[in-house]
Amino acid sequence: VKSAVENYRVYLTQLQTYFAQKKDLNAKFIDENGCEKTYAEAILDSFNSVRFLTALRASALGVEELNREIALALRAEKLLWFRQEDDWYIGKPIMITENDHNVKLYNGDIGLCLAKGKVWFGNREVSTSRIPAHEPAFMMTIHKSQGSEFEHTVMVLPTEPNPVLSRELVFTGVTRAKNQLSVFANEKIWQSAVRNTVKRQSGLGKLLQEKEE
């Protein structure tokens, strides 16, 4: 949770700075890499540069509990302001959990609430009243992260053995990281997971060894 607070402090501080400067979130600018983007996209890029992944949904280190704890910790640091955790509050990240072709939002899409009643998906602004089923996205399951890559991936494994932990699941989590991987796990659980092979995966052992080094 502490690691999440420090990493998410970046995009939330950026958001507060833009508000203080009264930036139009849909206005475009040229970033330090010479790329044209909107201020909303810049905040989303900051949020998406790091992703926290966990193996389970329901446990002390599952996605549901960690999403709750991270939100409360960010509020304690005065980086977020909300009364109830399920409120729409500025800075809240969400992940769509069902397809809605009318709104053109699909399972796995990530958005940020950056203004009252409005969520941005890239440079697209959608009213909160039109958002389909969703959940907080401070933390997501390794399974849900398939197909995505992040500059920095933080992977959290449970403290007790669980049938869902497998070599393939670890492989999925490890390969989400483009440049940096952090793992929160005790050695016994890690070794148990990488030995639990569901199906053969060519080159997996070598990749895991390289990542550990």
Predicted regions located by residue number:
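Contiguous effector/interaction surfaces
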Residues: 92-99, 123-129
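Conserved helicase motor core of P-loop NTPases
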Residues: 1-94, 100-102
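Aromatic-residue detector
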Residues: 11, 15-19, 46, 68-69, ...
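C-terminal accessory regions
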Residues: 107-213
